[in-house]
Amino acid sequence: DDVLRKNLNNVQLKNQLPPSPVLDSHDFTVEMETGTGKTYVYLRTMFELNKRYGMSKFIIVVPSVAIKEGVYKTLQITEEHFKSLYAGVPYEYYLYDSAKPADVRNFATSSVMQIMVMTVGAINKKDVNKLYQSSEKTTVDDLDKPIDLIRATRPIIIVDEPQSVDGGLNGAGKTAL
């Protein structure tokens, strides 16, 4: 927590903001106007977190299927760019699909950087969601539900357009991840 707070204070000071004396949570907000490159900024941030701190599990949560597809398209378009900026950093990205539980298993067990894009509905609809159902295809050790595998990786969660995601990732969705 001290390292995180010091980094936060450095960013605050560089931007003429008063430094926070304590770190109240591990949740950070970056606000940018529409069309200013927010998707690129958070993708680049993921690569920097991987480079500097070895963080390798990232989940991008979006409010709709259309935005999910847009983020995926951006990942495709920027793939060569990020490979040239971060030479030698292998990574995989994919859309969460409840019909493909092997993707969740790969996310949890792979040693390369993982980027999963999912809608908030995939997290919040607990009653009908395969994310919360046991599956032999996702079992690792004593974890048999996809959500448990994801949670065990302690991923970095990026919420795209949190104002459009029913109350952000409050309640069940935030707790789940």
Regions from the PLM with identified roles:
Residues 1-177:
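RecA-like P-loop NTPase motor core of helicase/translocase proteins
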